[in-house]
UniProtKB/Swiss-Prot annotation:
Cleaved by prepilin peptidase. The keyword Nucleotidyltransferase does not apply. GO terms for biological process: protein secretion by the type II secretion system. The lineage of its organism: Bacteria, Pseudomonadati, Pseudomonadota, Gammaproteobacteria, Enterobacterales. This is Type II secretion system protein J. It is found in: Cell inner membrane. Component of the type II secretion system required for the energy-dependent secretion of extracellular factors such as proteases and toxins from the periplasm. Part of the pseudopilus tip complex that is critical for the recognition and binding of secretion substrates.
Length: 206
């Protein structure tokens, strides 16, 4: 005798739908988690690239400090807190090595640059000459974001100092301490060669 065909009961259909919905939700959560991880990784990579570019730029500048009389500063170098409209320390100096291939541009390879903290951004100031006019405004380039502190220390014949008041000599070394909101305190130390103003870099992070 032929058995009557039997369809799905309402309970079985509802159970199947519930299982399908649960699986879909789980898959969606996994996908969202993967996307969030990818976004977080991309943000971290972008941040690390920003830090690398910023500290490389500072290394190029500080490694080419030269002693040169400028606008009342015997060596063209000064560093003070709250100068240059900075929220913390600021520094200004003359550097060599400003590229001028074949001397095409009507200028030397010397350039005045500076660093300051504005808001939470470490900025680089630069002029189109080593002797800018007093009324000339510098060009401004953001270097690092998320900065909560910018401190300078100076190494001289008496060791590390919190100020540099010797107008006749460059410091033998400069420590730059940058405090970041996400990575904390990072220190770069530049050793300045007295004769040429060239500097090499040492690094410490904590």
């Amino acid at each position: 005798m032929k058995q009557p065909e039997r369809g799905f009961t309402l309970l079985e259909v509802m159970l199947a739908l519930a299982i399908f919905a649960a699986l879909s939700l789980a898959a969606s959560q996994v996908m969202n988690g993967v996307m969030r991880n990818d976004e977080a990784s991309a943000r971290k990579e972008a941040r690390l690239a920003e830090l690398q570019r910023g500290f490389s730029l500072m290394e190029r500048d500080f490694s080419q400090i030269v002693p040169r009389r400028s606008q009342g500063y015997e060596l063209g170098f000064y560093a003070e807190r709250y100068q240059l409209s900075s929220a913390d320390w600021a520094v200004s100096f003359i550097r060599n090595g400003w590229l001028n291939p074949l001397g095409i541009m009507p200028r030397s390879e010397l350039q005045r640059v500076g660093y300051r903290l504005r808001g939470d951004t470490l900025e680089r100031l630069f002029y189109d000459s080593s002797e800018p006019l007093s009324t000339q405004e510098p060009a401004v380039r953001p270097v690092l974001t998320g900065v909560t502190g910018f401190v300078l220390r100076f190494f001289g014949k008496d060791g590390w100092q919190e100020r540099w008041d010797d107008p006749a000599n460059l410091p033998q070394g400069i420590a730059i301490v940058v405090t970041l909101r996400d990575y904390g305190e990072i220190t770069r130390i530049f050793l300045i060669t007295p004769r040429y103003g060239a500097a090499t870099q040492r690094r410490s992070e904590r």
